[in-house]
Amino acid sequence: NEVSIWLDDKIVSKPNGIFAEDTYLVLGNSRFLETCDLKSNKLKIIADYGKGIDGIAADGKGNYFISDWSGNTSLVFPKGEILQLLDTSKQNINAADLCYITEKNILLIPTFFDNRVIAYKLIKD
């Protein structure tokens, strides 16, 4: 029963968002979305987002929704492509951590200072 450091790597700079999969963690930091293998501790960058990542949620298809504090919400694909879904920064609405309900295709985004949770129903084009 001893506490010890599990991972200490400079690539994980200012970590904030975290999402647990079966065999790895998905980490969002001040710039990158990356994975960390739970057995080997090996880090792999998925995407260069360029700014701080707050929320991370899986879509159940190998992609990840991410949010940042300024109000952007995006979908990140396995090869690193980033599709911006929402930008609420002009309305001064932050995007905090988020949650995706796969069975209902609903993305929940707490807005922090706006004092509400917004639910978005995702519909295929």
Regions found by a protein language model. Give the residues of each.
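Short active-site-adjacent structural elements
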Residues: 73-75, 84-85, 92-95, 116-118
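Beta-rich, blade/repeat-based domains predominating
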Residues: 9-32, 49-64, 68-70, 91-105
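Hydrophobic "anchor" residues
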Residues: 3, 43, 64, 73, ...
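Loop/turn residues immediately N-terminal
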Residues: 31-34, 70-73, 113-116
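Short loop/turn segments that connect beta-strands within beta-propeller blades
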Residues: 1-2, 37-41, 77-81, 121-125
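A short beta-strand motif characteristic of beta-propeller blades
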Residues: 2-9, 41-48, 81-88
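Blade-level signature of beta-propeller repeat domains, shared across WD40, Kelch, NHL, RCC1
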Residues: 94-125
